[in-house]
């Protein structure tokens, strides 16, 4: 969705945009790989964005698409000297080559795929579309501290399962340090194995509301605590109190009973992506994808078709306004973009982060974009 639309067709000057996409489409292979199938969905989503943008603005769009697996990568790269921006592939080595070329020729390069790519640090014009882990942790911790600093804040409780993988121990340690600095008291509840309602009620009076902090993002660990937390939430609700359970980006992938329990336990987690499957823009875009390509986009996190759509719609909106980077946040169907330049970094990085919060009884979570 063009939530940041400026001029309309009636008063917009016609602009010319030259965009290159370099994707592993495997057009010469007898059988498509999973990577090429996802790249094709991305490409198809991007084409839908071009179509939608073209219906709103009279700009001229020259889109060049290169298959990075066809053996002509070096020659294709050398032909990009006059494009406005390059969308880079899911390939570390090729991104490095593209970065050297685009940095030398002052061409923005848009990384839609590799979360941990760091070429933006040392290369001008590189655009890393994924918020970095350090910044993501900092923003999530800021949000938790702000929540727990309110006058009527719930009491924080850290769950410490002796048999937990504790894959988020680093995050929890940082959060505890911050809570200590802010003078926010918290309780640590130790247990071993499955977390039962009785363990919670024996240690936490139901006369208060609680903010539970977990130490793992894994589904297997979540399954050890979800049922007990859901039952405990009912006990709290009977006395007019609430339960919030803080979790992690992996929780966005939960399906079935695990997903159903997110609302029951008052789940709150952060993520680089979020799709409102019942949203009008989502349904419209998925329907258009089906109409044009005869099938639904492949499911995944992120959905590659929507990633392609959001990437291209952002790029076209920015180029329409005269730059590769917008001077304000942009909220798409699945991704949000708010590129920033930080000291010591030659390129730019997306600073947007979703906070997803489930409330018991609500049909869908509330979403905040930081």
Language model regions located:
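Short, well-structured alpha-helical segments in soluble
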Residues: 70-84, 198-207
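Extracellular/periplasmic periplasmic-binding protein-like sensory domains
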Residues: 229-305
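Periplasmic-binding protein-like
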Residues: 21, 81-92, 109-113, 154-161, ...
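Segments of small-molecule ligand-sensing domains
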Residues: 295-369
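Hinge/beta->alpha junction and helix N-cap segments in small-molecule ligand-binding domains
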Residues: 65-71, 113-115, 129-136, 159-171, ...
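Sec-dependent signal peptide cleavage junction
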Residues: 1-17
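Signal peptide-proximal N-terminal region
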Residues: 30, 37-63
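Extracytoplasmic ligand/sensor domains, especially the bilobed periplasmic-binding protein
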Residues: 87-174, 253-255
């Amino acid at each position: 969705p063009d939530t940041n639309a400026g001029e309309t067709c009636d008063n917009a000057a016609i602009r010319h945009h030259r965009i290159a996409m370099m994707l592993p489409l495997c057009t010469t292979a007898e059988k498509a790989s999973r990577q090429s199938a996802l790249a094709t969905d991305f490409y198809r989503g991007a084409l839908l964005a071009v179509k939608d943008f073209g219906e709103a603005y009279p700009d001229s769009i020259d889109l060049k698409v290169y298959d990075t697996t066809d053996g002509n990568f070096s020659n294709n790269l050398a032909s990009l000297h006059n494009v406005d921006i390059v969308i880079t592939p899911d390939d570390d080595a090729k991104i490095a080559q593209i970065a050297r070329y685009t940095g030398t020729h002052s061409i923005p390069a848009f990384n839609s795929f590799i979360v941990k790519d760091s070429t933006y640090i040392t290369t001008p014009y590189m655009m890393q579309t994924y918020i970095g882990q350090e910044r993501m942790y900092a923003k999530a911790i800021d949000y938790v501290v702000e929540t727990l600093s309110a006058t009527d804040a719930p009491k924080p409780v850290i769950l410490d399962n002796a048999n937990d993988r504790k894959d988020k121990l680093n995050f929890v340690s940082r959060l505890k340090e911050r809570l200590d600095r802010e003078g926010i008291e918290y309780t640590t509840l130790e247990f071993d194995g499955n977390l039962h309602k009785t363990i919670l009620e024996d240690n936490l009076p139901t006369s208060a509301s609680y903010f539970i902090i977990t130490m793992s993002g894994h589904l297997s660990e979540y399954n050890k605590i979800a049922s007990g937390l859901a039952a405990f939430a009912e006990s709290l609700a009977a006395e007019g109190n609430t339960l919030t359970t803080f979790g992690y980006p992996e929780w966005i992938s939960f399906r079935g009973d695990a997903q159903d329990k997110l609302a029951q336990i008052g789940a709150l987690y952060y993520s680089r992506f979020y799709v409102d499957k019942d949203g009008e823009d989502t349904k419209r875009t998925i329907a258009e994808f089906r109409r044009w390509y005869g099938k639904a986009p492949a499911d995944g996190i992120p959905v590659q078709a929507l990633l392609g759509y959001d990437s291209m719609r952002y790029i076209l909106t920015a180029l329409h306004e005269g730059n590769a980077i917008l001077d304000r946040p942009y909220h798409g169907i699945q991704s949000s973009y708010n590129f920033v330049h930080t000291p010591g970094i030659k390129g730019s990085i997306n600073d947007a982060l979703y906070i997803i919060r489930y409330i018991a009884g609500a049909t869908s979570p509330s979403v905040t974009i930081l």
